Structure formats: C-alpha cells, structure tokens
C-alpha cells in the first residue's frame, strides 16, 4: 500500500510536467484519476511476478496436490499482490463514479471487486493452511498482464494509439 501511495504522489506531482501540460490537461477528470491509478499497476506487475515465477520453478511438491509447503517467495508475492489489491479496492470505493466510467459500467466494476475481495480473503487463508500454493502462484504470475493493459490505456489516453508501442 505504501508503494502505491508513493507512486500516486509522484504521479500527481510530475505527470503533467512529464507528459506535457497540453496533453495532460486535455484528459477528462476521470481519465486523470485513471491515469494515476494505472501508473500504480506497473510495480506489482513485475514485483509480484519476480517472486511468484521462481516459486513455481523451485516448487518441490506435487503439482497435482492441493497440500504443500509454502515458500517464502510465494508468501512475499501474495503479500505484495494483496497490498496492491487492497489499494486498488480503496481507489475503486473512494472514486466510485470515476471508476464506473473507467471500467465501462457497474457490471465490470462489481466483477473486479468480487475478484479482489475473494483474492484478499482466500489466498492468505489457503497459504496459511498450506493449500494450493502451486496454483496460487499461477494467479500471482498473471499479474504481469497488468503491464500490457495499463500501458495500452495510457497510450490511448495520450492519443498514441497509432504508434508501434501501442
């Protein structure tokens, strides 16, 4: 949560200068909010994966068993991911109207909330009981896809959808 707060603060202070005042000011208010929150998705995309991927590679249990030891790498990846999801859930609830627009409606937003709440509650419970560590790592590795989605949104918001990077 602290990393997200720091990134949000840096984004609030410097995004307009880095992107350019004209381009940044052309965004709608809900787009500016989404801009800052999307920047917060980059660090967990890589930090969580940096812990979860080696946890999969070094997993010593049986991949078809639900019971296994939980590595320190899995615990760290889970903690980082839960911290990020808690932050994201807080942003969704605090900026509800902006987020409804950003997610394309309440239905998609409710689905996202359910995903976050289930993960926040069930992953730590399962890991504390030595359940599904191998499988949870696969969900944690999927966090890396946030990078692509957020980068695509940022490029579209900057009217850069005709670039090779997009």
What are these regions (language model features)?
Residues 1-142, 146-149, 153-166:
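Membrane-helix and juxtamembrane interface regions of eukaryotic multi-pass membrane proteins
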